[in-house]
Regions:
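Cell-envelope/extracellular polymer assembly enzymes that use nucleotide-activated donors
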Residues: 5-7, 37, 208
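Short, acidic, metal-binding catalytic loop of nucleotide-sugar glycosyltransferases
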Residues: 24-35
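Short beta-strand/loop segment that forms part of the nucleotide-sugar
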Residues: 34-47, 65-69
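A conserved acidic beta->alpha catalytic loop
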Residues: 42-51, 99, 333-334
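Glycine-rich, basic loop-to-helix element that forms the pyrophosphate-binding segment
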Residues: 70-87
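Short aromatic/hydrophobic "clamp" motif used to bind/position activated sugar donors
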Residues: 92
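Conserved donor NDP-sugar-binding/catalytic core segment of glycosyltransferases
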Residues: 104-149
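A short, conserved alpha-helix in the catalytic core of glycosyltransferases
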Residues: 176-177, 181-193, 200-219, 224-225
Length: 368
């Protein structure tokens, strides 16, 4: 059977009423007959959600897949990856299970596809009063555009105009990716190993994915001049914070040495899956232990780029390779002797004893 052009991946958790509205809006998409499939990726809801999706699947002409696993807190990155792993479309259109699609939404995203680009959108936030009155059977007859606050349309227009300027100036981190409405080529999502599952709790997994897509050479363009989705009101997630800098994931997000292909994504990447830049000087106990721990890992030549470049102090090596992460290993007691020129170039500095094999192995499995 021919693969679909696009896989709609809808994440959800314990919001069956909202999900029913989203499913109803997907059922009335126009201009895309036979071109899409739906994957509902659930984060451990009760059986009401499973029954809702099962009943919905019986009445629609497109494939519907449901996946779930036990709930262990807010794990949006993991849920999206589980959905992506089951998707067969050339394009992955990620959607939130609380945001209703306009009838031409999927067709608009398909028409906007370009190699090397991801299309990013946003939501119009519907007021509680409007959200409360929405019912699945009545969506086709409702003009959500008219019911949305004018201030929301003004906000989206400003965001779109800013995104055009940011792309023109080749801004390194903007426009930002909003995970509830974005489309990416499947092979590009695979290139960065999907979403980073080390983000647990609310926030920053979208920003991280956007940065890593850019690191892989993929550009992000706004689609807000063509389409958006409509967010149905609900109370905020308990792990959300009023200020993003107070979020539980912020320290991890702001770390230096981010790898384009994350270590805990669609596939786990152990130390033997990373391209390392290893020191040539192996005369110290710590440098010899490092070589032994990475004996089966791929290594880059001194003039080749790598993912993680490692310098051991004391030692004769310096950071010379082009690398995404620079790791400085300092033997215990020698940190003060390490030149500041080496320390400044390092993204991460760790002090270890020359015989601490367990500590070094643990570090090599998670750095980056």
């Amino acid at each position: 059977m021919k693969s679909p052009d696009v896989s709609l991946i809808v994440n959800t958790f314990q919001k069956p009423r909202h999900l029913a509205l989203v499913l109803a809006s997907i059922a009335i998409q126009t201009g895309v007959d036979g071109r899409f499939e739906l994957v509902v990726a659930d984060d451990g809801s009760d059986d009401v959600t499973r029954r809702l999706v099962t009943d919905f699947a019986r009445g629609v002409p497109f494939p519907v897949t449901f996946t779930t696993e036990p709930h262990e807190g807010f794990r949006l990155a993991r849920v999206r990856n589980r959905g992506a792993a089951l998707a067969g479309g050339d394009t992955l259109l990620f959607l939130d299970g609380d945001s209703v699609l306009p009838p031409d939404h999927v067709a608009t995203h398909l028409a906007a596809r370009r190699p090397g680009w991801a299309r990013i959108g946003d939501v119009v936030r519907l007021p509680e009063s409007v959200s409360r009155d929405l019912v699945p059977d009545g969506l086709a007859a409702i003009d959500l555009q008219r019911l949305a606050p004018r201030s929301e349309w003004q906000r989206l227009r400003r965001r779109h105009r800013k995104s055009l300027l940011q792309n023109l100036l080749r801004h390194p981190s903007k426009p930002r990716l909003a995970g509830g409405n974005f489309a990416v080529w499947r092979h590009d999502y695979l290139r960065v190993n999907g979403s980073d599952e080390r983000f647990r709790g609310w926030g920053q997994e979208d920003d991280d994915l956007g940065l890593r897509l850019r690191g892989a050479g993929i550009r992000l363009a706004s689609i807000l001049d063509r389409t958006c989705t409509y967010h149905v009101w609900h109370p905020s997630d308990p792990s959300a914070t009023p200020r993003w800098r107070d979020g539980v994931n912020v320290p991890y997000f702001l770390r230096r040495g981010r790898l384009t292909r994350c270590r805990r994504g669609l596939l786990p990447r152990g130390r033997n899956d990373i391209l390392w830049g290893l020191p040539a000087d192996r005369t110290t106990a710590l440098s010899a232990l490092l070589a032994a721990c990475l004996v089966d890992a791929p290594g880059a030549e001194i003039d080749q780029p790598c993912e993680i470049d490692v310098v051991v102090w004391p030692g004769k090596d310096r950071f010379r390779r082009r690398a995404e992460c620079r790791l400085l290993l300092v033997e215990e007691g020698a940190r003060e002797e390490c030149p500041s020129t080496i320390r400044r170039r390092a993204d991460r500095i760790e002090s270890l004893a020359g015989d601490d094999e367990n500590g070094l192995l643990a570090l090599l499995e998670e750095v980056g």
